[in-house]
Amino acid sequence: MSTSNFLPDHNPVMMLQTPFHSRVAAACEMNEWGAWQGYTTPNCYTNVEMEYFAIRSNTGVFDLTPMTKYRVTGPDAEAYLDRLLTRNIAKLGVNRVAYMVMCNDAGDLVEDGTVFRIGEQDFRLCTQERVLDWMSWSAVGFDVDIVDETADVAALAIQGPTSCRILRNMGFE
């Protein structure tokens, strides 16, 4: 492909593919693709209406690799997240996940997503937007490390009313 048709200041960039891309591409009957956080992702697989009702009555699997993932560790990780999130992190058990909302000091919504408790002082936050600068600024006074793991951690969401049964049948508890 010749790049002579691009504007002089245009910098063509290859879109990233998730580790699940080959399976996703095989399932993408509509062949309608878009961009999400620099990754090539399907806009839908078969039919938007069918997909909506499938996840409400059965199970849907989604490639969430493009979502932003932060690892928060250190002696003050729980205290830091207890300040940052509108959820009592002390009540979140190890190997559990919960919905979370991040708010600034004025109580304004910054971002929402999920928080995974990997260990006593080891957490992963999964968000749509990139908020590392704000999280780092909010960590002043806390002994924590915050690392953007987005490029290193792939993710699948398995959702719907039959998802637990399917996972149990696969050997997961």
Language-model region placement:
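Acidic, low-complexity central loop/insert segments
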Residues: E111-E173
